[in-house]
UniProtKB/Swiss-Prot annotation:
Protein name: UPF0502 protein Patl_1161
InterPro entries cross-referenced by the UniProt entry: DUF480, WH-like_DNA-bd_sf, WH_DNA-bd_sf
Tree of life domain: Bacteria
Pfam families from the UniProt entry: DUF480
Lineage of origin: Bacteria, Pseudomonadati, Pseudomonadota, Gammaproteobacteria, Alteromonadales
Naturally occurring in which organism (per UniProt): Pseudoalteromonas atlantica (strain T6c / ATCC BAA-1087)
Length: 230
């Protein structure tokens, strides 16, 4: 059965999925690290301002659902997910499928082109066709529809896709047949524009990742300093 999440639960699960892959040396995460990652301004839509108490309550809710595991240590309790790809979870995803779900949990509905860029740091996609293939697979995982295609927005070339663990009531699901990844070929000018946009967004994402990494390291230093001065 598909797990149903609240918005804050989706954000916390997305953070744990992301940090497990992108900063494995800091995973599992402390309460402070989870809060910082939930509220970071890069790679998050919408930007949230959760308090540590709100994050702790969310972690407690996820623990009650058996979606996270608490790891007690000499310093502080740390948290890791049991959402997928563990011996305790029924949901098993490929690295590309996991990256897509993670980006959607953290940034909401995405087009295949956006997913190719934004999921690149978690799982490599050499072509947008690979994204579309993974999306089609996620539409039927052991009989569960983890992803749906939304109605195309006016003036947009691509439809967006949304995960189904946390549902935004404003999302309108498309009932049109899925379009094959190679059903149409863009002209040369459109391809050039798309390539330039993708390259620019990739550079921005790389800078955002660097800032996020520095923030995490700063929080870790602050935590160590606090422990030394107690």
């Amino acid at each position: 059965m598909l797990v149903t999440l609240t918005q804050s639960q989706a954000r916390v699960i997305g953070v744990l999925l992301e940090k497990e892959v992108t900063t494995p040396e800091q995973y599992p995460l402390s309460l402070n690290s989870v809060t910082t990652a939930c509220n970071q301004k890069s790679n998050r839509e919408p930007v949230m301002e959760l308090t540590e108490l709100e994050v702790q309550n969310t972690l407690d809710e996820l623990h009650a659902k058996n979606l996270i595991f608490e790891q007690s240590g000499s310093r502080a309790t740390r948290y890791k997910h049991r959402f997928c790809n563990t011996e305790f979870s029924d949901l098993q995803l490929t690295p590309q499928q996991l990256a897509i779900i993670c980006v959607m949990l953290l940034r909401g509905p995405q087009t295949p082109g956006e997913l190719r860029t934004r999921a690149q740091r978690m799982a490599g996609f050499t072509h947008v066709d690979e994204v579309e293939k993974a999306l089609n697979e996620l539409m039927d995982v052991n009989g569960e529809q983890l992803v749906v295609r939304l109605e195309r927005e006016p003036g947009k070339r691509e439809s967006r896709y949304a995960q189904q663990f946390y549902k935004d009531t404003n999302e309108v699901i498309s009932h049109e047949p899925a379009i094959a990844s190679k059903s149409s070929q863009p002209n040369a000018s459109n391809t050039t524009v798309a390539t330039n946009d993708t390259a620019q967004e990739a550079r921005i994402c790389a800078l955002e990742d660097t800032v996020t990494q520095l923030r995490c390291e700063l929080e870790q230093l602050k935590q160590t300093l606090d422990e030394l001065t107690r």
